[in-house]
């Protein structure tokens, strides 16, 4: 299984266009040892030629330009993107579909809940019907494994997660199973297994056992502390209110990962998170625990 980190930041990217927090200011001024990051998305392949996107970042055009494997190379106009899987309907995970309209029709896998959001509050399916048939919905049934024809060696098991639906969802304050997914991806040829969950609000015992099966954990790294947005002067909500488990504190992501084997990589990192500063004590804690911070262009093979 080939995994390409197309984007590794949370919504807004890093630096965020309207943010002057310590991290964003330091990166722009060159006083912070850190790397710019685009909004999160990954690509998966079982052969290096045909690819599946997991989420479609608003930065998808630049991400394709940075990854030759996705660029047109077989015809005057074509793409190696054979399908897309949406783990939720958050604006930073599906707006990239608009930028892919010239390549429609696209095969899009998502749950009934996500499909509802993208036909009502943010009606991408209806909008894109006008481009060569638009998006062909392939329903994801919770806990039922599925395969995508273009990458037959990969088996996807969708796992419902506790998180939050986006503000435009008709059930924003009434969570439903299927609003947010994690994916357990297994390669039948190599035996490699990936657990991918860029939006993860809570880890219970059954989910922990699922995570224990994975050779690589690619998980929510949004915030270091639950009140980080408030502390940085960038917002008024706790991470837990937005559906993100912070890294620090009792029951935080560090504590969860400490009890698990396999490669551990944080993704979907908010611009305020001190782990972006490569010289920060928080980053040093990750290094000491053997936890990596995803970066754009990172490759993982399982």
Swiss-Prot record:
Q: Where does this protein come from, organism-wise?
A: Azotobacter vinelandii (strain DJ / ATCC BAA-1303)
Per the similarity annotation, which family is this? Belongs to the PqqB family.
Which BP terms from GO are recorded?
A: pyrroloquinoline quinone biosynthetic process
Tell me any Pfam family this protein matches. Answer: Lactamase_B_2
Q: Record keywords: Transport included?
A: yes
Q: Where does this protein act, in terms of pathway? A: Cofactor biosynthesis; pyrroloquinoline quinone biosynthesis
Keywords for this protein: PQQ biosynthesis, Transport
Q: HAMAP family annotated for this entry?
A: PQQ_syn_PqqB
Q: What is this protein called?
A: Coenzyme PQQ synthesis protein B
Keyword check for Transmembrane, yes or no: no
What does this chain do?
A: May be involved in the transport of PQQ or its precursor to the periplasm.
